[in-house]
């Protein structure tokens, strides 16, 4: 959209193009110094939808702009310029009057936003009259697939869209968030995949086995769900057991199951490997007495391009689905991966539930991509818990409520009840 930041593969925002290009022309004319900060994006085909699909909309704009944008059009939703472009412009528009508003210095090369910038992010609501900042907010909403006019006015329509965004990214229960108002929580969620790392989590995942002290400490800290791994990698002892599941249940937590062993290089992924991993995950789930019909999230720990995802990850998940079907479809297939990979796999109908790996803000599959719809879990920051005689590390996660996980008392298979202790 505006600032040369086109919405790429999302057809829903194609309708914004003519308006955004007109806004670009307006900004160049009235704010030449500020616009000098924004460089035309480098051509790329990664995540790029076909330019021909945009031509009808582009024809509504003056000829010189059509020519310019058809030459430079790219999907910045897969580019590291997306955050730096918006934040540089935002800092320059805001000026140096706001102490600590160090956008240029605080935005890291990997797309992370520094703590000083987070602390200095402005509050915007219907009483705000800072047209320039509201324009940037509206632009950021467009880049996240939300339809809003870019006019610098914080009207009822903007309030409604902000509320919808806050709901969809899991901010509504945060005590720091005011519905329809934008502060650091909402700004961060708009500008980087992990959002504000300081926000409170209601779930977590960890590779470390939990004893009762650790599990109770998590519950007392407000965590209700914990992601645990089904099996042990060659150099680890991270696999959940039936005994640990009972301990977690006693502490009042629910579990969601993760399977990930060697999936951190592109060479790992193939249809045959998917079949192998599905069988291993199935067998581990049976041994640990995981109830029937629960989700197993298969991890993708590599930053694939869209092309790489189609060449490697789709065959991998095709193998998983085939093997699970051969085993009787006792478990649902989920995916644990960056945003764009999740979108591609769910679009190919190869997974039923999404665990978003948003912590890696520098991943090309995260930076600039909107949070997928109907996500179940969103991982965003690493935390270390100390106290009660224990110290351990885990990842902070937001649970949307789409999937509640399970515990040792969950009816196996739900309506198709079968005692999970009878698993072979």
PLM feature spans:
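Acidic (Asp/Glu)-rich catalytic clusters
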Residues: 19-32, 214-222, 238-257, 283-291, ...
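Active-site cleft segment of glycoside hydrolase catalytic domains centered on the general acid/base Glu
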Residues: 303-328
């Amino acid at each position: 959209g505006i600032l040369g930041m086109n919405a790429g593969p999302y057809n829903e925002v194609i309708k914004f193009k003519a308006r955004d290009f007109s806004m670009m022309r307006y900004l160049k004319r009235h704010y030449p110094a500020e616009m000098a900060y924004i460089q035309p994006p480098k051509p790329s085909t990664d995540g790029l939808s076909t330019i021909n699909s945009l031509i009808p909309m582009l024809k509504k704009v003056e000829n010189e702009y059509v020519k310019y944008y058809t030459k430079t059009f790219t999907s910045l939703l897969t580019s590291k310029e997306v955050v730096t472009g918006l934040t540089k412009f935002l800092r320059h528009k805001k000026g140096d009057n706001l102490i600590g508003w160090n956008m240029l210095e605080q935005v890291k090369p990997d797309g992370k936003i520094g703590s000083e910038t987070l602390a200095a992010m402005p509050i915007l609501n219907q009483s705000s009259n800072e047209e320039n900042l509201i324009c940037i907010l509206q632009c950021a909403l467009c880049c996240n697939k939300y339809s809003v006019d870019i006019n610098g006015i914080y009207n009822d329509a903007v309030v409604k869209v902000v509320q919808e965004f806050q709901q969809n990214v899991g901010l509504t229960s945060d005590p720091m968030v005011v519905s329809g108002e934008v502060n650091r929580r909402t700004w961060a969620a708009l500008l980087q995949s992990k959002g504000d790392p300081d926000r409170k989590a209601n779930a977590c995942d960890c590779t470390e086995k939990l004893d009762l002290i650790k599990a109770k400490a998590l519950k007392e800290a407000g965590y209700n769900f914990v992601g645990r791994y089904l099996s042990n990698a060659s150099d680890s002892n991270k696999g959940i057991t039936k005994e640990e599941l009972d301990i977690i249940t006693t502490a009042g937590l629910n579990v969601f199951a993760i399977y990930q062993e060697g999936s951190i290089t592109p060479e790992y992924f193939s249809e045959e490997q998917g079949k192998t991993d599905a069988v291993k995950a199935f067998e581990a789930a049976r041994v640990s007495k995981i109830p029937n019909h629960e989700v197993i999230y298969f991890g993708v720990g590599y930053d694939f391009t869209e092309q790489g995802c189609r060449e490697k990850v789709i065959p991998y998940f095709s193998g998983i689905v085939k093997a699970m079907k051969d085993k009787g479809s006792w478990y649902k297939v989920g995916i644990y991966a960056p945003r764009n990979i999740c979108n591609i796999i769910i679009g190919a109908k190869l997974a039923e539930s999404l665990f978003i790996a948003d912590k890696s803000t520098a991943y090309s599959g995260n930076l600039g991509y909107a949070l997928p719809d109907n996500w179940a879990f969103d991982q965003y920051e690493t935390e270390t818990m100390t106290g009660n005689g224990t110290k351990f590390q885990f990842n902070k996660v937001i649970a949307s409520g789409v999937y509640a996980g399970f515990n040792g008392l969950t009816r196996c298979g739900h309506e198709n009840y079968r005692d999970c202790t009878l698993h072979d």
